[in-house]
């Protein structure tokens, strides 16, 4: 049997089993891999809810769901490093979930919220954002271990998605009728600009050298639960 290791992090105790040694060979215990992949699945689920909420016209809740996905996206990698459960499968699964959460979900939010009033042009603008997110994620995948981790090449897809979500919230508070407003074209331009920033060659500081231990894991989970409560209120 493997040796049990107890690791305490920000007040949370994790118990992880080391690799078992059977007939002189180490057998990796796969249970710990479920934790980060489960968090990734929750991020994907939140993105799926955002898509359905956008289609039903619940734009504020759809935007909140994108915020939840962004928080969970930061938590899965953190959990993987903490549990030493990083894997190629987890990286690919996370990337596919990010495409839904930060590519499709914000694009559909922008379209149903405002761009639909521009007809095919609005649909094209939403597609540009989604396509740029796909390009950005693909480029990020092949640059892992190649570029300086302190910087992103192009705006990170979660941040671009949050720009769409937060601007939607602001415009909802202003109670603008996009069916009769000239601001619709500006929102379309804004959507395209956010997309193009993702595929630009501009370097953005990644904050990956920031001490994330200052933000306890339980605080992030509390933020997620609070947003979930607002969505289902």
Model-assigned labels for residue ranges:
Residues 1-24, 149-233:
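C-terminal membrane-associated helical module and adjoining short loops/tails
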Residues 1-74, 203, 223-227:
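Topogenic membrane-insertion module of multi-pass membrane proteins
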Residues 4, 15-44, 79-99, 138-159, ...:
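Interhelical loop and helix-boundary elements at the membrane-water interface
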Residues 23-26, 30-40, 56, 60, ...:
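Membrane-water interface of alpha-helical transmembrane segments
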Residues 33-40, 82-137, 167:
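Multi-pass membrane catalytic core of lipid/isoprenoid biosynthesis enzymes
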Residues 39-42, 62-66, 125-132, 160, ...:
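Hydrophobic alpha-helical transmembrane segments of polytopic
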Residues 49-64, 100, 104-124, 167-186, ...:
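Helix-coil boundary and interhelical linker segments in multi-pass alpha-helical membrane proteins
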